[in-house]
Amino acid sequence: MAEQHRLRLGRVSIPGQAYHIITASHGRAPVFADIRVARAVIGVIGRMHQDGWLHSHAWALMSDHLHWLFTLGERASLSATMNRFKSGSGRQVRAERPDLARVWQDGFFDHGVRRDEDLRAIARYIIANPLRAGLCVNVGDYPWWYAEWL
């Protein structure tokens, strides 16, 4: 609980603000290595974009965590948006993998992108995660990433 409180300290939720979010699977289990689970999570990311909760700029779904760069929409706060994502994706994942009691760890890390920061540079950092983790030799070889500029 104290860990969760520290995650929330200083959190500011501003519609139209870009955020880099990192959220992990429960117990850092490699559940997203399962193609069915990865597709379920990616489907919810797409629906949240289509439904106007946010505007996705880039994301990389790793085996045990998600990096996501988006601009927050007008519909809800950052915390409410992430709660919707985690609950919706959790339901979809458990439909594919009923053996998973929990999908996500509590909380998430967020970085509000400053005006002087380059969204494309952050997107490059995000999509290079599979390279740095040794999961692929070329970004294009890793299936679970997106960047609107590529």
Where are these predicted regions, by residue range?
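Short catalytic/metal-binding and nucleic-acid-binding patches
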Residues: M1-L150
